[in-house]
Amino acid sequence: MSAQPEQTVKLTVDGREVEVPKGTGLIESAAFAGVEIPVFCYEPRLGPPVGACRMCLVEVEGIPKLQAGCTLTAQDGMVVKTAQTSPKAAQGQNATLEFILVNHPLDCPVCDKGGECPLQDLTFRWGPGASRMTFPKRTLEKPIPLSPTISLDRERCILCYRCTRFSENVAEDGQLVARNRGALSLITTFEDEPYSGAFTGNVTELCPVGALLPTQYRFEARPWEIQNVPTVCGLCPVGCNISVTTREGKAKRVLSRNHPEVDGGWLCDKGRFAFGHVAAEDRIREPLERVRRRGFAPLSWEAALDRAEALIRAAGGRIVTALSGSETVEQAYALGKLLRVGAGAHSAVLPEATSSALDAFAAPLSTIGHAELVVVLGDEAVTDRAPIVDLWIRQGRRNGAEVTEAADGNSLPEELTERLRGSDRAVLVWSGRGGGGGARLAELAYSLGFEGKPGCAAFHLPATPNARGVADGWAAAAEGEEQDPEPVALLVVSGDEAAADPAVRAMAERAEHVLAITMYHGLAVGWADLVLPGTSYLERDGSYVNLEGRVQRLRRATIPPAPDELAWISRLAERFGVAVSPHAAVVFAELSERLYDGLAYAEVGERAPLPARPAYQAPPPAAVQPSPPPPAPPGEHFLADLRLQRYRPLFSGPAVERTPELQFQRPPAEIELAAEDADRRQIATGDTVSVRSNGTAIELRARVSRALAAGTARIAEEHAGDLHRDVEVVKA
């Protein structure tokens, strides 16, 4: 059956005839004709237009009064005149700007929006050259701290309602509201509580004036002093496209670059505000060697490479490499060549990665926003693993999709399974731990007939930003069987995220030597014999593979305090007779032949495409089986009748820990208990409880949840310490 031709309408804008799809708004229709209609409040991503600012006034033939262009839909035969051809519309826009500026403070020289302000630009083009008002301007208390991350200047606010509409329609938190009415309207939060949530910072980018500003950027730079470096966020697997604003080589703010298929122009607060971690006080800026009784002593780079070479050679291949999933593909590949080819060490602890079998069901994340049925699997909140995916799910629900949650693919009701099988716009999202999650999801999608349906997709949300790329890069570095060296002569730990893995921590305790590659004086340093400085995603050139399977470019925005990983890996590999380039582009060209069908570095560009879907290839049976939980270690015995679930909240991890403005968002030190288990123990929310596990005991605040399954308990990973999988919880 052939597709129905798209219905179109013809209209005339400023004497130019244009044909557009039926239902297109007038603002977009005018843009098709090459005519700009100025706007303040209009933003299609925020939902239906509200016509609040009246900046878009146009004259429509047959209608006596000026109309708000943003509220109009193109009609066949419509004749529109904008301010460029209609004196009436020009006068209306001039008057609109004059009224907006009546109480505006005109403090452009000290306003952080000055030089990149739509109000400045439109006033220059369409507004009055001078004010007729002689009375004093209204003054208000300022700045108002909406939260530790956002400052509000109410004198500058033009009441476009972009911020309140974002809060109500996109984030759906309803925290930002307009209090009072008319000229007395003020933007605020209910009960003046701090504006908190995963996505609050987006209002600072939506604001068309300097009313809402990130506190980190106030009085930091002017637009003519900065550079905006296009790169990709490296704090979760979505891979949001960002611009890092730098001044004199230092990061000052992060803005969205709006990839409509990946992030839709939104950022989470972690990605927007946590850039300050690169300047943390405990940053490691030079190699360190453990010296008996004296802690650590700094080393020259030459001496550090000598020491690293000696450790690797002495290990004789009995080396395990623990990768965090934050490395670039090039770093993982280069480290793999050094250790696998140069030292014959093939054993690695890799982050939980998305299965390549899911490539057969790959699709842009924006597919979720147009789905009719979304099923979320797993036991972790989508916001914690991939926050922007949560916004896509919310958008899908607003567009009419049914959103259902289930524990796993094995427990789907038969009726839901049949609906998934019969749908052409169904999406599966797996958010949770468990070995084989991606492979099991691929099998489920295949069994539901998703293959060959462009509107159907399956997304696995890894816990780390580049899990897929790191696993692929390590595997492509060399051929060789995975080993299980015992005892471990050398443990190479890359990043504090890897060090937080209980399996890695247990291995570090019994390894003869530990080489840590890390940015901070954190967990990994406590075990290390040799520490080599690591870098942030803001300081790297290279590539990441996001959860869609999209290869994206990282560009260095700030200069690291020490040589980056590729630089010293290249020098160290040379000592083992292995050729590794210190340049990411050269390394990418080499690995691309093995991984990406020869994709050129330049082809990745600033807005990377999504590869075409291959035919489905079933994952090996071992990949589909859930990983068995590690056995409880020997030690003091407790009646441990609850299974502990560790999870990583969005506002956790090394970057957030080192961002003062985000401390109010960090997870409380608490344990979440199922209501049934709490009742048995006579525990209520707010009680202090002791959590015990094989000789380890910690005290936490209890929170009772009716959404948690009986027999399980949840603790944020940063508060779980050395607790094992089976715990006992008693009232303290």
Q: Where are each of the predicted segments found?
A:
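Glycine-rich, charge-decorated loop segments at or immediately adjacent to ligand/cofactor-binding or catalytic sites
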Residues: L358-D359, S411-E414, G522-A528
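Active-site phosphate/pyrophosphate-binding segments
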Residues: L305, A407-D484
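Acidic/polar loop patches that form or flank catalytic/metal-binding clefts of enzymes
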Residues: L212-R218, T245, A251-R253, T321, ...
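A generic structural motif
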Residues: G344-S355, G400-G409, S447-A467, H513-H521, ...
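A cross-kingdom feature strongest in bacterial/archaeal respiratory oxidoreductases
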Residues: Y42-R45, G336, H370, V374-V376, ...
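N-terminal export/assembly segments and adjacent metallocofactor-ligating motifs
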Residues: S2-G25, A31, E43, E59-I63, ...
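Charged, low-complexity terminal tails
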Residues: I37-V39, L46, G51, A68
